[in-house]
């Protein structure tokens, strides 16, 4: 919900529904739960009793597929309203016994924010554990344009000029492009601005990395 805070509503809905449908196509016995964290720009809406926009769009998907969700804002707001919590603190300051939830307005602190999230999630999981085990049958899509068929394709499968060099997985540059997910199967390198890759596709969205 935080990372999608300003994302287009349909992109959010298409992405979330695509994830759900991909998971249940692969294994209908997989249980899914949506988790909604929060950051400082959401506070005005939350204090007014409204879910933030990204949460509202994700909830349309959760409701349609009967997926449980956990909103971490509730316990945070309760402490904030009781003046027991500082949402964005300064690590160099003391706050007379109050819980410092974040130091940057987004990421919960280890000593203050994480225990609140842990309490919220633990309570919610105990509640969800009462539900009956069952397979999840896929029904007609809520959004026909969802990203259920989205996939990653190695760049080597596209037409490209001969100047590109396929990097070894032992190459440091290869590792630098992987990130935490280790998602890229191949990485090509070129120092010639005339080298090219041609991508032809049929669909509504394409990304090249």
What are the roles of these predicted feature ranges?
Residues 1-134, 187-209:
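Alpha-helical cap/lid subdomain in secreted, periplasmic
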Residues 130-200:
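Glycan-recognition and processing domains
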